């Protein structure tokens, strides 16, 4: 998902991904195994990811709450409030607790100062870089409106939610920095679905299953939010040929099943590109985007 943008950064602490460091630390401690009686165990790895995401989000929100409640007090008192907040959520060896408290302090400090927000100069440079190369959405691959299109139609832009937005891959509100490796061109629609979620595992994907083969009925189950989760799970690339959706010739997408003998459910479906359909690489397919 990474698209690097060339920006000058004079404040490295604003670019550091403290959130990713915290996620990696928590993930190393979460040893949640998928039951051995499940045949396709790999398909359920999202359960562990969801737990890690939840713990990180809870810790960040709890730390922000603790800081806000002690905003007028000395720094040491506020630091102690964060340490107590960590102790309320998890119980790890002392040095691990201390490291988590340190990372949360850095994250909350930056959130309070809006430190991960790009400067006007940085944003203009990134936008210009993306516009010059006509970057499409890094998740769904749709063409973006940069406001300078020769046939720019404001009504279409508003209706299709295609406006260019700059996305922090790891959300600012969860500790993501403003470094060039954490930025990508995104459409308004995907950015709204993504919000402060950390991965597709944060969506209610268990509800997405249908016994029907009727395209209309299947489409009702796999609505916009779940289609977004599928695209995010695949890293913005076709499940069959591996090509990034933003590099395909057009914007067509098809919903296909991994196992055609199984029903349409989240762990059994994938999204394929129009080029795979044209190349007869799909045994079946429900078109979900023209």
Provide a role label for each language-model segment:
Residues 98-151, 173-175, 206-237:
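Short, charged surface segments at domain edges that flank catalytic/cofactor-binding sites
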Residues 137-141, 187-190, 238-241, 273-276:
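Short cysteine-rich clusters marking metal-coordination/redox-active sites
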Residues 144-183, 243-271:
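Histidine-centered nuclease catalytic patch
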Residues 161-162, 169-189, 197-212:
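Glycine- and acidic-residue-rich phosphate-binding/metal-coordinating active-site segment common to enzymes
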Residues 183-205, 269-290:
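Short Cys/His-centered divalent metal-binding micro-motifs
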């Amino acid at each position: 998902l990474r698209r690097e943008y060339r920006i000058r950064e004079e404040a490295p602490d604003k670019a550091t991904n403290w959130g990713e460091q915290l996620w990696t630390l928590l993930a190393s401690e979460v040893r949640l195994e998928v039951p051995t009686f499940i045949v396709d165990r790999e398909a359920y790895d999202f359960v562990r990811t969801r737990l890690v995401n939840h713990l990180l989000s809870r810790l960040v929100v709890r730390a922000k709450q603790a800081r806000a409640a002690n905003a007028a007090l000395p720094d040491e008192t506020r630091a102690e409030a964060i340490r107590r907040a960590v102790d309320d959520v998890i119980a790890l060896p002392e040095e691990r607790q201390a490291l988590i408290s340190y990372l949360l302090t850095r994250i909350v400090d930056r959130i309070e100062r809006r430190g991960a927000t790009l400067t006007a100069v940085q944003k203009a440079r990134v936008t210009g870089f993306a516009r010059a190369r006509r970057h499409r959405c890094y998740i769904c691959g749709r063409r973006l409106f940069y406001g300078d299109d020769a046939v720019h139609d404001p009504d279409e832009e508003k209706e299709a939610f295609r406006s260019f937005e700059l996305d922090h891959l790891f959300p600012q509100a969860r500790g993501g920095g403003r470094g060039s490796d954490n930025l990508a061109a995104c459409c308004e629609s995907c950015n709204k679905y993504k919000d402060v979620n950390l991965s597709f595992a944060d969506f209610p994907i268990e509800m997405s299953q249908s016994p029907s083969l009727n395209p209309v009925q299947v489409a009702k189950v796999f609505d916009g939010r779940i289609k977004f989760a599928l695209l995010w799970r695949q890293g913005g690339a076709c499940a069959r040929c591996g090509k990034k959706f933003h590099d395909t010739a057009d914007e067509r997408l098809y919903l296909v099943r991994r196992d055609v003998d199984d029903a349409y459910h989240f762990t059994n479906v994938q999204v394929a590109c129009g080029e795979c359909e044209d190349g007869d690489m799909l045994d079946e397919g429900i078109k979900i985007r023209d």
